Amino acid sequence: MLTSLRALPRAACRLSSINLFHGRSRQNYATEAKIPINIMEVGPRDGLQNEKGVIPVDVKVELIEKLGLAGCQLIEAGSFVSPKWVPQMAGTGEIISRMHRLPDVHYGVLVPNQKGLEGLLSVLNSYNASPDSDSTPPPSDEISIFTAATDAFTRANLNTSINESLAKLAPVAKQALDKGLRVRGYVSVAIVCPYTGQVDYKKVREVAKELLNMGCYEISLGDTVGRGTPTQVAEMLEEVKKELPVERLAGHFHDTFGTAVANVFTALEHGVRTIDSSVGGLGGCPYSPGATGNVATEDVLYALKNSKYTVIGTEYGKGTIDLDKMTEIGWWISEKLGRESISRAGRALRAKKIRDAEMVADGEVRAKL
């Protein structure tokens, strides 16, 4: 069972930078150093934003805390967007203020515009004025900004063109950087647009470069519709890498057509070292008709077992992200939402756990006969 985060002592230190390490693989990679990769857990934000029912603040807080205890060190905790348009993200300020924050975890929030940034800064100002500011990590140390690779998608999502969205984001990024925040960028519909079809990868490269020039430390390239294939992912990345360092890129894949895990491996083989994923496969996009959830964190973790890659995590996951704990969390949050986890690995691991428990119980009964 997951330990209660409330029982843990508060660490008297600030958030540390990401600590990459080299582990040793087994089996086929017994003599080679593993390649470290990061997972950005987007379940609390991208995973929940498209849910129809009301999700209590307490549940969101508990979700983020559980993820930290499972070893996640990169967590997108919410977004400062209009509750009129994305009601599930209401209360993000309260959530990041209330949650027990671990010192070696980065808690990011998405801000779509200047107003969103002002909402976050208000929370941070309250934190800085509190007596706990010297002994507890801040509510957030990172923002994400986003645009897309087609005008049709930005007009549906932001009611603006790509160029107009970039012009509005530039001062947001600058102010955030001036305040000491890290800035991450998203490029949606990097492969297929739900409104215009196949995307021009040169446009993906151009938009990603603009975000990089704004000061984004990393650009997440999204297969928002989930229609991308490994071949398309490879072609897109090769185009973007012509002008952007691959170490500044991340992959964000939805699993609409069941290709997300394959796309993750393609991205890794092309040098990408950060993958966005969502516990329980939560997710979708309100402006992308037909899109299903993000690639499940459990599926990524399971697929990477015995590979040449190692996922970086915190001490709570023993230096990685604990697959068993993530499976528990995936089922817990899915049940809170009134459904089963859609993670394939999560379903299989839970079924195995139930079977094993039944076999133990059956053995105990037979022993008493």
State where each predicted segment sits.
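Catalytic cores and adjacent flexible loops of soluble metabolic enzymes
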Residues: 2-369
